[in-house]
Amino acid sequence: MARLGALVCCLLAAWHCRPGLGLPLAPAGTGPAVGQFWHVTDFHLDPTYHITGDHTKVCASSKGAEASDPGPFGDVMCDSPYRLIFSALDFIKNSGQKVSFMIWTGDSPPHVPVLELSTDKVINVTANITTTIQRLFPNLQVFPALGNHDYWPQDQLPVVNSKVYNAVANLWKPWLTEDAITTLRKGGFYTQKVSNNPKLRIISLNTNLYYGPNSVTLNQTDPANQFEWLENTLNISQQNKEKVYIIAHVPVGYLPYARGISAMRKYHNEKLIDIFRKYSDIIAGQFYGHTHRDSIMVLSDKKGKPVNSLFVAPAVTPVRSVLERLTNNPGVRLFQYDPRDYKLLDMLQYYLNLTDANLKGESNWKLEYNLTQAYDIQDLQPKSLYKLAKQFAIQESKQFIKYYKYFFVSYDSSVICQGKCKIFQICAIMNLDVISYTDCFRQYHMKHRL
């Protein structure tokens, strides 16, 4: 693999285009100003990406498969060229949106065979993206979370201090306090209050410790004592009357495109769900990446009352495997919240039509949808999302057809999700623990004899 730093510098120097601006949403009414923050995830930079006549050699991340239709902003068989990542961040910079902070939920390196990377190469990729963000947003507070690819070998994030943990702690020092840096070095997680929102706390979890492929943490009930730390942190926040946003890479709950598969080990998923239910009165939102798709989840308590809203953001990378027919257009998103109590009010999803951008040779990031307007709901509170999910479950639901289009970031609106496909989605949206999830499938089986 070519030297990552040199190639990135070369790509940056070659950049001349400016992305088109999306449609900013001005706060309405005479109430207090609406708070805003950006969420970006899964950049997956592939520095080997280049245009060549041999489509099997366009990028290392295609693993020898032919690129589909490679252009300046990438290809669906490849991870992101630097130009795509820069266009996303430059769009954010020039969008006209005033924000308090940004969350970045991990995965900077490409999907390549393990021997094509190393600890130093992984750190170098993370450093390249970190310095790009810091250069474009010198005065913006950014809260990162580590992804399963932000380590080498991938997925094997440890429970003790490591070279990667030390490296990201040093890279992210401009954004974080000394206390946050200390726990980041120890276990890859941290907490910190938002500087201009004194009663809002960010908790950045290292959920990669619970990820199935992580053999380092196999059979450990509380890797790196993160559960104990999380409960202590939430307990103190509760006493101090703070609100909390949870950010992480690997999400809780079940994957919406397969039956019975949770993104993390079931024991750890159940433990996290128990903690989130216990402190749902102060957790004002949860934000994840990892799946590359756009999805929502609603956490209910054991009596079935919706108590938490969860959002999985789509990736910037458009990559798909040879076994997949569909993928996502690149996306970034903007959340709006009430600055008085930090309740989530709305979300604006922006995207880049990759085919169009490659044809025109310039990026034109656009507003894909505004969540409350698209679904005619009041806000992003658990009650509103739960009601929306109930509408999704209706047969021939136009709302669900729209949701599934957005699931792939408007990559292919002709695809229909029905039958088992729809059941997978509905059960995953509304049921995050094993008992309710299993019961969801049982009810559908009895009703539809599937």
Curated annotation (Swiss-Prot):
GO terms (BP aspect): negative regulation of cGAS/STING signaling pathway; nucleoside triphosphate catabolic process
Signal sequence region: 1-22
Binding site for Zn(2+) 1: D42, H44, D107, H292
Listed GO MF terms: ATP hydrolysis activity; phosphoric diester hydrolase activity; zinc ion binding
Enzyme's top EC category: hydrolase
Chief location of this protein within or outside the cell: secreted
Keyword entries, A-Z: Disulfide bond, Glycoprotein, Hydrolase, Metal-binding, Secreted, Signal, Zinc
A Pfam family hit: Metallophos
Compartmental location: Secreted
Cross-referenced InterPro entries: ASM-like_Pdiesterase_prd (IPR017064), ASM_C (IPR045473), ASMase/PPN1_MPP (IPR041805), Calcineurin-like_PHP_ApaH (IPR004843), Metallo-depent_PP-like (IPR029052)
Any single GO CC term annotated in Swiss-Prot or TrEMBL for this entry: extracellular space
Known partners and oligomeric status: Monomer. Homodimer; homodimerizes following 2',3'-cGAMP-binding.
Its job: Cyclic-nucleotide phosphodiesterase that acts as a negative regulator of innate immunity by mediating degradation of 2',3'-cGAMP, thereby inhibiting the cGAS-STING signaling. Specifically linearizes 2',3'-cGAMP into 2'5'-bond pGpA and further hydrolyzes pGpA to produce GpA. Also has in vitro nucleotide phosphodiesterase activity with nucleoside triphosphates, such as ATP. Has in vitro activity with p-nitrophenyl-TMP. Has lower activity with nucleoside diphosphates, and no activity with nucleoside monophosphates. Has in vitro activity with CDP-choline, giving rise to CMP and phosphocholine.
Record protein name field: Cyclic GMP-AMP phosphodiesterase SMPDL3A
Provenance organism: Bos taurus
Gene behind this protein: SMPDL3A
